[in-house]
């Protein structure tokens, strides 16, 4: 499972700066759920090939209302969700009573905690950190989050228990250095046909992992119990921590599934609870582990930013998507038309995803969801050969030629599969990285239409074909040199 790192500390110690530094390496979800998660922000970060979730808690001022009250509202929940807690202090401001109060509380909690002294740039770091030894820590880590100094080493140490090979990967230069990181996206990973085949083999003959996600009280639990009830699977509560989703194997129409329940499967008598527990971490973990994501939306409420944030995270993770608009029963025709218009307006960027209008409570339309789930999974995992992809690429360029770049037309040579779930098409050619985004979108839509891909995002990667003779001096043979001398002599004689 993907590890979770929580940033805890009093206000203005640099938690948000470190949070932004860690999450900007990917265009990842930064979800803010006011009222539900208080002031906590959740983001996805990556070090090398390893993903993790980072939580930015609100500032804790233990000297005013007491640590217990403050943490109970925002940070205590984050600490429970986390695998590692980074307790941040300000090296320039020195030790404060708030720091001492927070440290005293953290000592009572059985959670891996690391003391991080921030803002040590431009000062004597050891002298600035000396007072913090009073907090009774075994070791501390000095960083400058604003510049990224010490951040990579800190994260390596924090994640080391979860990824034993993380430090060895760093020695091989595989871990991205977060120091003075630019805002521009990291270079795209190069994919080979061998990578694609290996990816496909892992997916074949595996049960489809289906994650049901959505904001609180949209009907996730009702839908989960409806699905399990139809399949006559025993509904049970599995023990685990608050951040663990429940994995329920099931079978439908001869196809095996693993249902990832983020809401918590309830016994039938408890389905109608009015308050539903909601964990962002649980949802993000479920999306990362799923093949297909079923996003449940409440038809009786407008599409919210939370809905879009969850959808955006699923897209960034490359997951297949099916949309279920719940509580459709009982709405009059005028309201239904308005809901459909709102869906078209706000969800136009996922026009490849099937939308189902259902009633989880009464079971209307629930059975058809699995038709779209299978279609999306099939689209994400169908093998496509190099010859087919190259032919589609040629057809696309014939219908609409690539643009000119510095007086030369971009040339696309061939295409092959680079991966599955999501499908990745790798296109080789000259100056391909100079292609404008509009033409890249054209190619993506052309491949989607030609391959009849539904329910899954598709990614296009571009690789420049290197010229083997570039920067090589062209040495002439002896016969070529004699011919050149004769030609030059003839030119001189003609001038005379």
From Swiss-Prot:
Residues 382-466 form the KH-like domain. InterPro entries: AAA+_ATPase, G_ENGA, GTP-bd, GTPase_Der, KH_dom-like, KH_dom-like_a/b, P-loop_NTPase, Small_GTP-bd. Coiled coil: none annotated. GTP 2 binds at residues 214-221, 261-265, 326-329. GO terms for biological process: ribosome biogenesis. GTP 1 binds at residues 9-16, 56-60, 118-121. GO terms for molecular function: ATP hydrolysis activity; GTP binding; ribosome binding. Residues 3-166, 208-381 form the EngA-type G domain. Keywords: GTP-binding, Nucleotide-binding, Repeat, Ribosome biogenesis. GTPase that plays an essential role in the late steps of ribosome biogenesis. Associates with the 50S ribosomal subunit. Belongs to the TRAFAC class TrmE-Era-EngA-EngB-Septin-like GTPase superfamily. EngA (Der) GTPase family. This is GTPase Der.
């Amino acid at each position: 499972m993907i590890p979770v790192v929580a940033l805890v500390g009093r206000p203005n110690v640099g938690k948000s700066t470190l949070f932004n530094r860690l999450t900007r390496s990917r265009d990842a979800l930064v979800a803010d759920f006011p009222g539900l998660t208080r002031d906590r922000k959740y983001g996805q970060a990556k070090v090398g090939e390893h993903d993790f979730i980072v939580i930015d808690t609100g500032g804790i001022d233990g000297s005013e209302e007491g640590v217990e009250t403050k943490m109970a509202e925002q940070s205590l929940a984050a600490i429970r969700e986390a695998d590692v807690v980074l307790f941040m202090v300000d090296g320039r401001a020195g030790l404060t009573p708030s720091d001492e109060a927070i440290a005293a509380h953290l000592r009572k909690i059985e959670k891996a905690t690391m003391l991080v002294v921030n803002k040590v740039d431009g000062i004597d770091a050891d002298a600035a950190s000396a007072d913090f030894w009073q907090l009774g820590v075994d070791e501390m880590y000095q960083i400058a989050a604003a510049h990224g100094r010490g951040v990579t080493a800190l994260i390596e140490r924090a994640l080391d228990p979860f990824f034993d090979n993380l430090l060895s990967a760093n020695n091989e230069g595989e871990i991205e250095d977060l120091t003075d990181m630019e805002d521009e996206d990291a270079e795209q990973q190069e994919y080979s046909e061998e990578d694609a085949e290996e990816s496909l083999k892992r997916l074949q003959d595996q049960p489809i992992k289906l994650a049901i996600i959505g904001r609180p009280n949209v009907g996730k639990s009702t839908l989960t119990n409806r699905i399990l009830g139809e399949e006559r699977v025993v509904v049970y509560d599995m023990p685990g921590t608050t951040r663990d989703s429940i994995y329920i194997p099931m079978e439908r129409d001869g196809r095996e599934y693993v249902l990832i329940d983020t809401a918590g499967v309830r016994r039938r008598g408890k389905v109608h609870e009015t308050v539903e527990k909601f964990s962002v971490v649980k949802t993000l973990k479920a999306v990362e582990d799923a093949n297909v994501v079923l996003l449940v939306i409440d038809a009786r409420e407008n599409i919210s930013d939370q809905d879009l944030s969850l959808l955006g995270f699923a897209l960034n993770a490359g997951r297949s998507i099916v949309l279920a608009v719940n509580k459709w029963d009982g709405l009059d025709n005028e309201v239904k038309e308005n809901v459909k218009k709102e869906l078209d307006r706000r969800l136009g960027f996922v026009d490849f995803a099937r939308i189902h209008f259902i009633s989880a409570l009464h079971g209307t339309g629930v059975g058809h969801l699995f038709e779209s789930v299978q279609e999306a999974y099939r689209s994400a995992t169908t093998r496509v050969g190099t010859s087919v992809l190259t032919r589609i690429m040629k057809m696309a360029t014939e219908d609409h030629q690539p643009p000119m770049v510095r007086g030369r037309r971009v040339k696309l040579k061939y295409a092959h599969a680079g991966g599955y779930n999501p499908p990745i098409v790798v296109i080789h050619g000259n100056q391909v990285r100079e292609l404008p985004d509009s033409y890249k979108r054209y190619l993506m839509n052309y491949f989607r239409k030609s391959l009849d891909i539904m329910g899954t995002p598709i990614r296009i990667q571009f690789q420049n074909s290197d010229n083997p003779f570039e920067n090589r001096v062209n040495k002439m043979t002896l016969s070529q040199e004699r011919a050149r001398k004769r030609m030059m002599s003839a030119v001189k004689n003609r001038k005379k």
